[in-house]
Amino acid sequence: MKDLNKNDDEQGGYDLIVLGAGSAGFSAAITGADAGKRVALVGHGTIGGTCVNVGCVPSKAMIRAAEAVHCAGAAKRFPGLSGRAQVDDWQTLVQSKDDLVTTLRQKKYADLLPEYEDVDYIDAGPARLIEGGVTVGERTLKAPRTIIATGGRPVLPTIDGIEEIGALNSTSLLELEVLPKSLIFIGAGYIGAELAQMMSRMGVKVTLVARSHLLPGAEPEVSEALAAAFEAEGITLLTGLSYDTVRRDDAGVTLRVIQNGKPVEVTADHLVSTAGRRANTKDMGLDAIGVETDARGSIVVGEDMQTSVRGIYAAGDVTDRDQFVYMAAYGAKLAAKNAVLGEDHRYDNAAMPWVVFSDPQVAGVGLGEAQARDAGLDVK
């Protein structure tokens, strides 16, 4: 692997350009190199992408720590036992999480690149697509095929005042220097559910707020069972509502919602938005070359992972497909094989597994009941 962070005017001779150095980008680049192709892997910022840096790895490390706190206190369920654990040094716990992230990023990403001589890693600023290649900083890279794997980022919901209160997201929550006494979580999907329970077990008073209900993508019975478990642990759930306003004053952050036609206010030290993510497609020149995106900016791809422009593919969180790290790597591998080998692999998520790292854990494989009915299948 050669690091080409220099200012040549143009570098050609590549068979494939991969934009993004996360799980999808690495999967695509390695697949291309294994096929004997010369690959330019274009990163921007910290190598490794969402999962290892700010997603799966740090959140699961903290969830595991919170489990230790909870299980110690749960010993009293058994006659003759008692136990108690608490967070004595939040900053040390956060630092241990950061150390784990650094170690895994090095082992799983940075140390892997030198094994692939046909992959040139380039980190010289954001890339912009042009006809037949991309521009990166002051340089132009040329290749007949390009795979976009630039990932996604957290976004704030549209609530009056939310831009002014210093709202946290799933990344900044785990970077707090001081453990808060109370938190409001907006969004009750799998990210919100995992982080809300984790912080509650750390001793934080948690209110979880959602327009619909907890885990809206799960079966209703599962959602209800998990909601009961959360409430038994002291988490306050506010669901079936609309957001009105949010403000910050000396008392903290106050969120006002409308529930059953009546205003309800809840106050906490911070508000954490886990209400969704958006694709990293801004300023990439997609419109100029005709790459179709949906209303949220995600790149629309076919079953072969190709975009609306021939020769340009996309995979991972930047697309309108499944937002899981293993599906990102899977889709990127298909895209690379189709792009550089001319094969016709098709994205298939019919038996896709998924899991929510709550307690109790929630997992599934394939279609849910509602999805199966929508697909015209007989459900008993």
Region annotations inferred by a language model:
Residues 56, 150-205, 209, 237, ...:
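Glycine-rich dinucleotide-binding loop and its adjacent helix/turn
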